[in-house]
Amino acid sequence: VVTWERSGGEFDGKSPHASRLSGDQLTAGEHPEFPVSEMSPLSDGTIYSLFFQGIDRAGNRSEPTVIQGISYDVTPPAISGLSPPDSAYVNHTRITYELSEIMAEGSVIWTQIAGESDPRSPHVVDLMEGERIGGAHSDLTLAAAPLLKDGGVYRISVEGVDAAGNR
């Protein structure tokens, strides 16, 4: 039996979620991924403990194996409040943005769209750990700010992936 039990985060009124393994799932050895059927959906934003317990053909129960602190997250991160806005005239590379959650990885991309030719465009700057924290980041000079072409017109975008792999 595989059981997901809420241990924190968002409320899950259907917890615990249990499913019986069957067929090839019951064979000895490693099973890196397998679908769990006949189980109600988990709740986004909930933290679960995962319990595995088996019974052999003689009816002997195994000791339960428990994995704690599994965050179930299916919501893509939201990136908002990006500044400077399109068509702004600036003489710096400071930006403002807001992240809905901590990002596992992220980047800011300056893509030239007009003006003086910039053969190095697009400029992709990976966000450092402190720049990926959830919340507002105001008038920030990135640790690895790009060297943009004077007279270039750029579109700025921010991309990110959260710890669950949501983009």
Question: Which positions does each model-derived feature cover?
Answer:
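Solvent-exposed loop/turn segments flanking beta-strands in beta-repeat/beta-sandwich domains
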Residues: 1-17, 98-121
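Flexible, low-complexity linkers/stalks enriched in Thr/Pro that connect modular domains
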Residues: 56, 66-80, 162, 166-167
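Conserved structural position at the C-terminal beta-strand
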Residues: 52-54, 158-160
